[in-house]
Design a protein with these regions (language model features):
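An N-terminal boundary/leader segment
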Residues: 1-50
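Short, well-ordered beta-strand elements within core beta-sheets of diverse protein domains
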Residues: 9-15, 93-98, 209-216, 332-337, ...
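Acyltransferase
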Residues: 20-25, 54, 246, 271-294, ...
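Residue-level signal for inorganic ion chemistry
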Residues: 27, 49, 221, 258, ...
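Structural helix-boundary/capping segments
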Residues: 33, 111, 161-259, 264-266, ...
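Short helix-loop capping/hinge segments that flank enzyme active sites or metal/cofactor-binding pockets
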Residues: 69-89, 248-261, 302-357, 369, ...
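Short glycine/serine-rich loop/turn segments
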Residues: 69-211, 263, 370-387
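Small-aliphatic-rich amphipathic alpha-helix that forms the alpha element of a beta-alpha
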Residues: 355-358, 387-411
Length: 449
């Protein structure tokens, strides 16, 4: 059962050929089997998940099918508030924190009948791309347990990749959905800034924070996005923009114009990733009407750190010892950026977001490698100095948080050592339907799920 896609499992559930209880039990058994090695979950909602599954089974048997997520086990990154369930942010500071309200995306998932199976491990407070710095221990890559799963949504990516859940919700401030998706061989989508509510999600950098799905294929990604996307009038960053039928859009056959962004995204690539990109570009050429080389505007670099410090200053000033070494050092470094530099960077960010749409005049979509390098070992990650400059694997993902553009990572090959490689595709604001449609075409052409 764990190898089924959301779409496949949903069809079987709707036709009453399998039960939500059996599906959930299968995931719980997989968690019991694999989580001691992978460390993808911080909290497994065992009893609650089974109760949700039994409720879903009763409704479906009575003919009250809520939609494609009804009865499907879904995981949540452990900085997304869940009423009555620990939400730790992978930090000693919040090790016993229990929210009283659900995040908006949790409310939407519950309304859709999803079975929330547990809270997933991450980089402490989501600041970093390894998931090796967690109060609850590092997340291990399913393809090589000595290597990082990526981050900060590493637990979510690893859980989906191993069938511990059918999909997951992560957050992405500099690549934290797309980079672990690439490292774990799955699909990860960062929607347009404001497309998915962040209310009830512990912030990292509010100007750059996005919430998005991680799934094993593009169809499942579309189904999960359909449920969590939409305006939230209580979230000041939420965009009031129309929602497309994302699953239906996958069947639309077009040949878009593709923009290849060479600098700096194709520079200093690992040789095996470079080879995978060459092969992917050949396939993209067959799926597109034109392929051009495109330049993107530079992005300001002094936005994230001051915003992170602003979020944490009240905790850090009183309880610095409750932060892990990596997070503690990063917060100390953040104090070096003065207020004027931040204000100027924030103004530049607004200008970049207003102007970046111009790059889509000659093209419809942009393509880059998701990461320039494969995942490093957990030991290497732990030995690294806490500096954003050292996280080369986030170089290609970070700019798209600044742009706010919808961006997806999909599998496009493996290294000789069997480590997954990701292809990154981006489109104009609120073009998720077209983006998913093209990602689906690539997925089908390369026979990857």
């Amino acid at each position: 059962m764990n190898e089924l896609s959301i779409a496949e499992a949903s069809d079987l559930l709707r036709r009453k050929q399998i039960s939500p209880v059996d599906l959930t039990t299968s995931c719980l058994n997989r968690i019991e089997q694999l989580n001691p090695t992978i460390n993808a979950f911080i909290t497994v909602m065992h009893d609650s998940a089974l109760a949700q599954a039994r409720a879903a089974e009763t409704e479906i048997r009575a003919g009250n099918w809520r939609g494609p997520l009804h009865g499907i086990p879904i995981g949540l990154k452990d900085l997304i508030d869940t009423a009555g369930v620990k939400t730790t942010c992978a930090s000693a500071l919040f090790a016993d924190r229990i929210p009283t309200k659900d995040a908006e995306i949790v409310r939407r998932l519950k309304r859709a009948g999803a079975v929330l199976i547990g809270k997933q491990n991450l980089q402490e407070f989501a600041w970093g791309g390894t998931s090796a710095s967690s109060y609850f221990g590092p997340v291990h890559n399913p393809f090589d347990v000595d290597r990082i799963a990526g981050g900060s949504s590493g637990g979510s990516a690893a859980a989906v990749a191993t069938g511990m859940c059918f999909g997951a919700i992560g957050t992405d401030t500099g690549g934290s959905v797309r980079e672990p998706a690439a490292f774990c061989g799955i699909v990860g989508l960062k929607p347009t800034y404001g497309r998915v509510s962040t209310r009830g999600v512990f912030p990292l950098s509010p100007s750059l924070d996005h919430v998005g799905p991680l799934c094993r294929n593009v169809i499942d990604t579309a189904l999960l996005l359909q449920v969590i996307a939409g305006h939230d009038k209580l979230d000041t960053t939420s965009a009031d923009a129309p929602i497309d039928s994302y699953a239906n859009a996958l069947q639309v056959k077009t040949k878009p114009r593709i923009g290849i962004v060479r600098a700096p995204f194709f520079e200093d690539l690992d040789t095996e990733i470079e080879h995978a990109m060459d092969e992917a570009l050949k396939q993209l050429g067959q799926l597109s009407s034109d392929v051009l080389e495109i330049d993107l505007p530079s992005t300001p670099g002094a936005v994230q750190a001051p915003e992170v410090y602003a979020v944490h200053s009240k905790y850090f000033s009183t309880s610095p010892e409750l932060y892990g070494p990596w997070m503690r050092e990063r917060l100390k470094q953040a104090t070096a950026i003065d207020r004027v530099a931040y204000i100027e960077a924030r103004q530049e960010l607004d200008r970049v977001r207003r102007s970046v749409g111009d790059v889509f005049s000659p093209v419809d979509l942009l393509v880059t490698p998701t990461t320039p390098v494969p995942p490093i070992t957990i030991r290497e990650a732990m030995d690294m100095s806490p500096s954003p400059a050292g996280e080369l694997w986030l170089r290609n993902t970070r700019p798209f948080n600044a742009y706010g553009l919808p961006t997806i990572s999909i599998p496009c090959g493996f290294t000789r050592a069997g480590l997954p490689i990701g292809l990154q595709i981006s489109g104009p604001n609120f073009s998720e339907a077209n983006l998913l449609s093209f990602a689906y075409a690539f997925e089908q052409a390369t026979r990857r799920r």
